[in-house]
Curated annotation (Swiss-Prot):
This is Cytochrome c-type biogenesis protein CcmE. The gene is ccmE. Belongs to the CcmE/CycJ family. Residues 132-159 are annotated as: Disordered. Residues 132-147 have a biased composition (Basic and acidic residues). Residues 1-8 are cytoplasmic. It comes from Shigella sonnei (strain Ss046). One of its GO terms (molecular function) is heme binding. Keywords: Cell inner membrane, Cell membrane, Cytochrome c-type biogenesis, Heme, Iron, Membrane, Metal-binding, Signal-anchor, Transmembrane, Transmembrane helix.
Length: 159
């Protein structure tokens, strides 16, 4: 093997080692930010394709609806407990903090936290879903103003 080929081989090995090290460091840095999404039914019975169930202590995101009558607030602190459900089951959630303005019973939420024993989630963050038909107040006012205009405004000037 001549010197030129040896140098190319060493350069290729160095590039591959550097790439592997970079990928390893990125994955190590992101491991604390990777949260898998589950529904309450998937927490209870596992993911449909793989039947993989989350482990106690695993960080995850859970999406579902807040069960009617399940919200309980501690009068002495910001601690709130509630139940989220889907068609296949329900899980209990504990959260300490200020809830979003759109949070209410019967509304969709996504909670991010850790799974504890007994299918209980200790939430670090609660996100309330809004209706897909939501319109900002400014846009709604503009739409109402346009609908009140006389019909002559909408006619084609060429006709």
């Amino acid at each position: 093997m001549n010197i030129r080929r040896k140098n190319r081989l060493w350069i290729a090995c160095a590039v591959l080692a550097g790439l592997a090290l970079t990928i390893g460091l990125v994955l190590y840095a992101l491991r604390s930010n990777i949260d898998l999404f589950y529904t309450p039914g998937e927490i209870l019975y596992g993911k449909r394709e793989t039947q993989q169930m989350p482990e106690v202590g695993q960080r995850l995101r859970v999406g579902g609806m807040v069960m009617l009558g399940s919200v309980q607030r501690d009068p002495n602190s910001l601690k709130v407990t509630f139940t989220i459900y889907d068609a296949e089951g329900s899980v209990d959630v504990s959260y300490e903090g200020i809830l979003p303005d759109l949070f209410r019973e019967g509304q969709g939420v996504v909670v991010q936290g850790e799974l504890e024993k007994g299918n209980h989630i200790l939430a670090k963050e609660v996100l309330a879903k809004h209706d897909e038909n939501y319109t900002p107040p400014e846009v709604e006012k503009a739409m109402e103003a346009n609908h009140r205009r006389p019909a002559s405004v909408y006619k084609d000037p060429a006709s």
